[in-house]
Amino acid sequence: MPRAEEETENMTVKKITPVLFVEDVEPCVKFWMDRLGFEKTVEVPEGNKLGFAILQKGNVELMYQSYVSADKDSAATSQAAGKGPTLLYVEVENLNEIIRAIKGAEVVAPVRETFYGTREISVKDPGGHIVTFAQFVGAQH
């Protein structure tokens, strides 16, 4: 049986982007743009609201889609949108800068040092998803 790396050596994965499903896309876009400097690169209206948006900063990208938009998209998308909140784990260079930027956000896990060498904080975004910001303080992984 061929090894997986031989079978996939010509298969290039360009990126993986999470899609977060929410009731209201606008406050989530505002959170990432106003607090963390992301840029909205794509927006798709859904009636008089935003149904979908892509946010980007450098080579980091995430997408938000409203439940209403997901229901109209496809059966698979609609089904995925019905599952609880997602946790995003975001590695950063300077956690103190992030803490200043997210001041006022709902903290779900205060700053802590982990056994795996990070200093991290977890907050809830306006859509209810958990975002953990982590800075490696020991040897890099």
Predicted feature locations:
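Vicinal oxygen chelate
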Residues: 2-19, 39-91, 97-124, 135-141
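Short acidic-aromatic low-complexity motifs
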Residues: 22-26
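Conserved active-site tyrosine of GNAT-family acetyltransferases
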Residues: 28-33, 102, 125-128
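Short glycine-/small-residue motifs
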Residues: 130-133
